Amino acid sequence: LISNVLFIPDNKEQGKYHPRIGAQRDFIFRSLSEEDKNAFNKLYNQYYYHRHNDFWYQQAMKKLPQLTQSTRMLVCGEDLGMIPACVSSVMNELRILSLEIQRMPKEPSYEFGHLNEYPYRSVCTISTHDMSTLRGWWEEDYQQTQRYYNTMLGHYGTAPAIATPELCEEIVRNHLNSNSILCILSFQDWLSVDGKWRNPNVEEERINVPSNPRNYWRYRMHITLEQLMKAKELNSKISELIPVSYTHLRAHET
């Protein structure tokens, strides 16, 4: 029933309504005329992205400075998805690092983020705990994977059906050489570069599926720490990848 409405009653002020989040994905929106769709989208964007912008800016500047000034650590903000327009300026003002994920570009005209365009004050990563890993994402949407293979990696021909260790290493290397000050990758994405040590079952790599309340944080390493410490080829490969990216970072700073 809830998916058949465009507006939700306000729970504090009777007789007032606000646009329902994600209504554009449902039949009720698709059944509208183009004129009505445009009208709804204007209301939607105004309500969620502009109307409360000053309010959220004031709230942020009231609370965040106390947090950022109470520690010497670098502070990273999770600024993905549906956020007010003021977030970027607040983070820049307070020198909070943004989070950059290539498959979730912040530039609307991009299908994939451009690693060399990431802001220096940012954390670059391939996947988060709420997303599929690199290998899992590769197998989710073949057409999207094909476009990534051709445009982002610059390869010709048909993309492999699975993300091979060689492909994963290339993608990891690209991220390590991004413009971000930090590149922090998940354990699963690090292991993806080695065919011997990565999990044989790619579905077991994912940590959490936010849309599924039954999918809790049940990820477990499929190898022991003792095995990992003895994985000389894997450790050597990672040790070789990181200094190269560090050299790139130092060159950027100078």
PLM feature spans:
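Conserved small/polar residues in nucleotide/adenosyl-binding loops
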Residues: 247-254
